[in-house]
């Protein structure tokens, strides 16, 4: 099992690296992107309506946690890539067997899917 962070990247990307991270996102025209950031693959997507609180569920619709979003973005990354822990709760750090960021995606309704977990951002 791999520990995985799901949530707003602003809570886990170091302050010294935040601008560089944002520049990498701004250089991409898609609403979702997978890229290498400082040696770690990360999936980043825009939420449907920007900032807010979004719920993380598993495939049985069990509420796992609530994700605060202040940058209008959600990310999925290995916990090894976390640079800081700023205001995240246990619901944001989950275990995914054989985690591979290439298997993370969002659909046309801005619902994020990562393994058996999902986050709907279109309310």
Region spans (language model):
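Intrinsically disordered, low-complexity acidic regions enriched in Pro/Ser/Thr
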Residues: 1-123
């Amino acid at each position: 099992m791999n520990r995985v962070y799901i949530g707003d990247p602003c809570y886990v990307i170091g302050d010294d690296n935040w601008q560089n991270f944002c520049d990498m996102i701004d250089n991409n025209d898609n609403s979702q992107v997978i890229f290498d950031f400082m040696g770690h693959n990360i999936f980043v997507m825009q939420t449907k309506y920007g900032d807010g609180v979004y719920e993380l569920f598993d495939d049985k619709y069990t509420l796992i946690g609530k994700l605060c979003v202040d940058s209008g973005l959600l990310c999925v990354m290995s916990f090894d890539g976390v640079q800081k822990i700023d205001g995240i709760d246990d619901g944001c750090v989950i275990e995914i067997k054989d985690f591979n960021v290439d298997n993370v995606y969002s659909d046309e309704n801005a619902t994020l899917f990562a393994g058996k977990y999902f986050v709907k951002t279109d309310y």
